[in-house]
Amino acid sequence: MSLSDKDKAAVKGLWAKISPKADDIGAEALGRMLTVYPQTKTYFAHWADLSPGSGPVKKHGKVIMGAVGDAVSKIDDLVGGLAALSELHAFKLRVDPANFKILAHNVIVVIGMLYPGDFPPEVHMSVDKFFQNLALALSEKYR
């Protein structure tokens, strides 16, 4: 699903508003994913504490949202811009690509909770399309 110029503008505009709280969004989204989708915990079994708000969850939430911010800056070429990250997840971490969509869903939920006034249906749709394209780009090396 391609992103229109309007979609790209909506994603960039929302990112400008939420990026100061990106670390908190990432930690909350990851904590929710690990709770609501416990099968995702298998990728983080080496962490001592997988509970929401724990140090490792906060730290990785920051990493995740840093990658999302990077993706926003590479919105015109997600496949090329995220090739190294796709390779890491496919060959080293061996993450099932279905989990990218699960995490994206949780990020969208948290954005909607924290920024309801900045997240009308039109922006939600653009952000959802962006995350679909992001998940597809991260899945590129699995083929």
Swiss-Prot record:
One of its GO terms (cellular component) is hemoglobin complex. Keywords: Acetylation, Heme, Iron, Metal-binding, Oxygen transport, Transport. Residues 2-143 form the Globin domain. The modification N-acetylserine is found at S2. Gene3D superfamilies: Globins. Pfam families: Globin (PF00042). O2 binds at H60. InterPro entries: Globin, Globin-like_sf, Globin/Proto, Hemoglobin_a-typ, Hemoglobin_oxygen_transport, Hemoglobin_pi. It comes from the Eukaryota. Red blood cells. GO terms for molecular function: haptoglobin binding; heme binding; iron ion binding; organic acid binding; oxygen binding; oxygen carrier activity; peroxidase activity. The keyword Transport applies. GO terms for biological process: hydrogen peroxide catabolic process. CDD domains: Hb-alpha-like. Heme b binds at H89. Belongs to the globin family. Heterotetramer of two alpha chains and two beta chains. This is Hemoglobin subunit alpha. It comes from Cyprinus carpio (Common carp).
